[in-house]
């Protein structure tokens, strides 16, 4: 089943996993060591992140390493950027209003 990226990142544990593996690939056990939860729970989160292609797995010897799929993160950033631009415009407008009010007080 293909999952929605935004449903995947809605969970705080999965966001924390993304933050962890953004710096370096990690095994499920190494990831689980950073949480107060079971290895099975971390595996479930990794499966969801893998299904929505935010995370990729690579076999190295007997270990599986999970790493961040940068292109999928770029898709999220691109989608969020449209809202970033809207809010930047609104904050700039607010700055202008506040500057005008400040000048009128003097």
Where are these regions (language model features)?
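Short, Lys/Arg-rich nucleic-acid/phosphate-binding segment
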Residues: 59-65
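C-terminal regulatory/oligomerization modules of transcriptional regulators
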Residues: 1, 8, 19-34, 39, ...
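Pre-recognition alpha-helix immediately N-terminal to the DNA-recognition helix
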Residues: 15-17
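Short basic coil micro-motifs at the edges of alpha-helical modules that engage polyanionic partners
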Residues: 6-7, 65
């Amino acid at each position: 089943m293909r999952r929605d990226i935004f449903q995947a990142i809605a969970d705080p544990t999965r966001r924390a996993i993304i933050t962890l593996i953004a710096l370096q690939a990690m095994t499920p056990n190494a990831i689980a060591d950073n949480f107060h939860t079971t290895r099975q729970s971390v595996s479930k989160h990794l499966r969801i992140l893998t299904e929505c292609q935010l995370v990729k797995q690579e076999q190295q010897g007997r270990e599986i390493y999970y790493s961040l799929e940068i292109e999928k993160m770029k898709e999220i950033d691109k989608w969020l950027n449209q809202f970033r631009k809207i809010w930047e415009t609104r904050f700039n407008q607010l700055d202008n209003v506040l500057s005008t009010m400040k000048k009128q007080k003097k």
